[in-house]
Amino acid sequence: MSSFDQTMQFHFSEEPAETNVREVLLTVYGALQEKGYNPINQIVGYLLSGDPAYIPRHKDARALIRKIERDELIEELVKFYLQGQRKD
């Protein structure tokens, strides 16, 4: 069986992030709104491409978001979304 037929596992470190992902995303979201951009489109563009040009320098948003790896941002977004969808 080739390695393409097997499910790969992706592991994150369980150490707390130095930078609060939620605070960074909210700051970036606010900066994008203030500049007149669609924040969701811009953040998705950044997450998919890795191109920091999607994020403005306003309120130091570009520098803030670049301190966090994109996979960490995606992980936090998925966790937040799925936790909100659980019906326990």
From Swiss-Prot:
HAMAP family tied to this protein: UPF0297
Family: Belongs to the UPF0297 family.
InterPro entries: IreB
Protein name as annotated: UPF0297 protein GK2555
Organism superkingdom: Bacteria
One protein family per Pfam: IreB
Organism: Geobacillus kaustophilus (strain HTA426)
